[in-house]
């Protein structure tokens, strides 16, 4: 019986296995009501008009979507190393929580802000390195051209209020007295040289607006290739690096957390490039130009109004945004919790029905919805306060400027066109400033997300090639374990000085109780882990001193729990050797006794197997895995309890295929059922990480030792189960 399972009896009923293992989490969906809908939509549209058109998202290539585990006082803890997102699994006990908290607070108060700022600058420098590709002149030209279009767009944008002012003044003079028109002509000689009529000025106004928009679109078109290539390069590098990390790292991390880091990090790069480079910087340039123009044309008072209003607007927006961030976090957490609860309930649909607990599930789900509702209301109220405060600041500045303009008009120092121009310049600043809060919040979050992704690149694998590693030279496939010690945690030995030999071309079964270290032996031979001490050799070569790719290409593994890609059957078999021909794939399927079954499917080899192969039966999945290993044609075969979860008929079919696969190959079988072990040339019996017996099946039975006990126990269990079934 597998771990976490029970046989449950009830009056008149025999209920089959109840799996007590926790269900794996899957990516949560969002049902958010979007309380920031107006601001969110406006900001999204603004970014869409002024930045990269597409927002690439790296699809989930891993399976889970769970958050990283939080620290807890237990013998196992996650230790954060320098420039690491999360630490490896260590054995030291967690210190006193109070002491840890005190030390953490002391460190944070002295260096967290400066360290964070330095880390942010390092991230931006790293990103700049991807943008300014020294070995790619085309991309450097695109960056320079985009900056040129950026400046051109802002220069033309500032001309729009000027042209509108001139048109208003000209029309006002033309409808007034002759003296007014003469005065206008005398004060604007250049205008009359360029434009013949007020209509021509208005046409120029339209051309300036169109030109500004055209420059913005050209900037986007020129720069988008650079931005998208940057996202692609970083994402591919991180993805490849994750595959280069060792198994210990992946066992200490939740796969969904890694997926979310890459997904959020790639989107963060897109945001930083679009919002920061093409919106924040242009806004700063435009504010400087507008302030300078107002100071030059109308005096320092107007420049002060602009500068003070913009400064107040920024300070107020950043302060309120920082304050309301906690409400957004609470809302997002409630959203995630509700989504997780809903999905967890739905994937356990049958369990809910078995116990008639639909009402309970609905009530629990509603509790999470209530938390989301409360947090969303707080977010909405704080957003209303932010919008109202921004409106007061901007309206005050605009009204003050209009009052000064009206006084200037009454005094004869300004014209109606000047009032229109000042109004237009200030309104041009209002659009990007309206989204300052969103830009600030998203920028801070983007830097955090980018930091998490770039820190993945600083993770180092414990399993690497040595500097003088050589390819594995096979001379038959003789395997030798010599006094091997290994432990995942120092206080718990997994392998305690084991030694045995698998002769070339022979098969060895490894048996023992759960936790005795059987599967660990296969992992160490494949070099997912290195020994704490002792040596593992293949044909006399220490596997630590050979290249990983040559070692792993020589070994084929048939796991107990076969996981297939959510693709076609053909792809899953072909994955064993990507250079194989179509006919070789079919031949591998025949040897695994799965070809006829596949041929009876409506889509044959094009049948999609579903996520993790769940559309296939257990036996079909195992035979697809066998076909994949047949196609790889390794010199060494490792088989980890491949038939433990199968019925007797399917087990017999799989064993026949395994015999064919193991023929003339060095093979190691982890045997849960001793009927598998008895067919091997040699049997190694493990107990508490040590080899307690070794020899052929008949010889071990004759010794009446540990193997004989296991054999008797297994046969007795089968007899008792048969008797129980007959009693029913």
UniProtKB/Swiss-Prot annotation:
Q: What induces it?
A: In roots by cadmium and lead.
Q: Which GO terms describe its molecular function?
A: ABC-type transporter activity; ATP binding; ATP hydrolysis activity
Q: Which UniProt keywords apply?
A: ATP-binding, Ion transport, Iron, Iron transport, Membrane, Mitochondrion, Mitochondrion inner membrane, Nucleotide-binding, Transit peptide, Transmembrane, Transmembrane helix, Transport
A single Gene Ontology CC annotation of this entry is: mitochondrion
Q: Mind telling me which InterPro entries this protein's record contains?
A: AAA+_ATPase, ABC1_TM_dom, ABC1_TM_sf, ABC_transporter-like_ATP-bd, ABC_transporter-like_CS, P-loop_NTPase, Type_1_exporter
Any single GO BP term: response to cadmium ion
Can you give the residue ranges of the ABC transmembrane type-1 domain? Answer: 143-445
Q: What happens when the gene is disrupted?
A: Plants exhibit an enhanced sensitivity to cadmium, dwarfism and chlorosis, with an altered morphology of leaf and cell nuclei. Mitochondria accumulate nonheme, nonprotein iron. Decreased levels of molybdenum cofactor (MOCO) and reduced activities of cytosolic Fe-S proteins. Reduced ability to produce abscisic acid under normal conditions and in response to drought stress. Male sterility when homozygous.
Q: Where is the ABC transporter domain?
A: 479-713
CDD domains reported in the protein's UniProt record: ABC_6TM_ATM1_ABCB7, ABCC_ATM1_transporter
- Membrane spanning stretches: 144-164, 166-186, 188-208, 275-295, 300-320, 383-403, 419-439
Q: How does it assemble?
A: Homodimer.
Membership in a protein family? Belongs to the ABC transporter superfamily. ABCB family. Heavy Metal importer (TC 3.A.1.210) subfamily.
- Protein name, UniProt field: ABC transporter B family member 25, mitochondrial
Naturally occurring in which organism (per UniProt):
Arabidopsis thaliana
Give the gene that encodes this protein.
ABCB25
């Amino acid at each position: 019986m597998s771990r976490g399972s029970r046989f449950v009896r009830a009056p008149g009923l025999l209920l089959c296995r109840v799996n007590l293992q926790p269900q794996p989490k899957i990516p949560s969906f969002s049902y958010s009501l979007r309380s920031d809908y107006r601001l969110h939509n406006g900001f999204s549209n603004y970014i869409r008009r002024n930045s990269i058109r597409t927002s690439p998202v790296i699809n989930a290539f891993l399976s889970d979507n769970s958050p990283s585990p939080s620290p807890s006082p237990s013998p196992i803890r996650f230790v954060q190393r320098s420039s690491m997102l999360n630490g490896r699994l260590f054995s030291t006990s967690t210190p006193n929580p109070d002491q840890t908290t005190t030390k953490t607070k002391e460190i944070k108060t002295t260096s967290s802000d400066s360290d964070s700022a330095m880390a942010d600058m390092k991230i931006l420098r790293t990103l700049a390195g991807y943008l300014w590709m020294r070995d790619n002149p085309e991309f450097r030209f695109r960056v320079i051209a985009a900056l040129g279009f950026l400046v051109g767009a802002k220069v033309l944008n500032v001309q729009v209020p000027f042209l509108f002012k001139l048109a208003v003044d000209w029309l006002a003079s033309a409808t007034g007295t002759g003296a007014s028109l003469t005065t206008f002509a005398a004060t604007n000689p250049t205008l009359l040289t360029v434009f013949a009529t007020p209509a021509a000025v208005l046409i120029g106004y339209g051309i300036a607006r169109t030109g500004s928009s055209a420059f913005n679109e050209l900037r986007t078109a020129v720069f988008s290739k650079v931005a998208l290539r940057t996202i692609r390069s970083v994402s591919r590098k991180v993805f490849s690096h994750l595959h280069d990390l060792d198994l210990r790292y992946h066992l200490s991390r939740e796969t969904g957390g890694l997926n979310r880091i890459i997904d959020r990090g790639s989107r963060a790069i897109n945001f930083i490039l679009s919002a920061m480079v093409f919106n924040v910087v242009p806004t700063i340039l435009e504010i400087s130009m507008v302030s300078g123009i107002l100071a030059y044309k109308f005096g320092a008072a107007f420049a002060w109004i602009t500068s003070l209003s913009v400064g107040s607007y920024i300070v107020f927006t950043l302060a309120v945004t920082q304050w309301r961030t906690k409400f957004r976090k609470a809302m997002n957490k409630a959203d995630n919790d509700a989504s997780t609860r809903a999905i967890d309930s739905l994937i356990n649909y049958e369990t809910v029905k078995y116990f008639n607990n639909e009402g309970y599930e609905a009530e629990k789900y509603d509790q999470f919805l209530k938390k989301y509702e409360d947090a969303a209301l707080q977010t909405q109220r704080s957003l209303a306060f932010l919008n109202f405060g921004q409106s007061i600041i901007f309206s005050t500045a605009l009204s003050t400027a209009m009052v000064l303009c009206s006084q200037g008009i009454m005094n004869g120092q300004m014209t109606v066109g000047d009032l229109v121009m000042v109004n237009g310049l200030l309104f041009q600043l209002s659009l990007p400033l309206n989204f300052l809060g969103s830009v600030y919040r998203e920028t801070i979050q983007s830097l955090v997300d980018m930091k998490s992704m770039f820190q993945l690149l600083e993770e180092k694998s414990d399993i690497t090639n040595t500097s003088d590693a050589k390819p594995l030279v096979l001379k038959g496939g003789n395997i030798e374990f010599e006094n091997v010690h290994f432990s995942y945690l120092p206080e718990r030995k997994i392998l305690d000085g084991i030694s045995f030999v698998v002769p070339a071309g022979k098969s060895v079964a490894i048996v023992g109780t759960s936790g005795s270290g059987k599967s660990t032996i296969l992992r160490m031979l494949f070099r997912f882990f290195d020994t704490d001490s002792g040596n593992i050799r293949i044909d006399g070569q220490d596997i630590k001193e050979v290249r990983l790719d040559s070692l792993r290409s020589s070994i084929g593994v048939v796991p107990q729990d076969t996981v297939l890609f959510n693709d076609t059957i053909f792809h899953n078999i072909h994955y064993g050797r990507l250079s194989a021909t179509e006919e070789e794939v079919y031949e591998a399927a025949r040897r695994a006794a799965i070809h006829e079954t596949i041929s009876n499917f409506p889509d044959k080899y094009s049948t999609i197997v579903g996520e993790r192969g769940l559309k296939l039966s257990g036996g079909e999945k195992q035979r697809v895995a066998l076909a994949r290993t047949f196609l790889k044609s390794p010199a060494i075969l490792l088989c980890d309890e491949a038939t433990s979860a199968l019925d007797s008929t399917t087990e017999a079919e799989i064993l026949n295929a395994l015999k064919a696969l193991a023929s003339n190959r060095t093979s190691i079988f982890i045997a849960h059922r001793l009927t598998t072990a008895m067919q091997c040339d040699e049997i190694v019996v493990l107990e508490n990480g040590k080899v307690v017996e070794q020899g052929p099946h008949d010889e071990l039975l004759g010794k009446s030792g540990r193997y004989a006990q296991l054999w008797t126990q297994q046969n007795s269990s089968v007899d008792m189960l048969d008797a129980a079934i007959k009693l029913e």
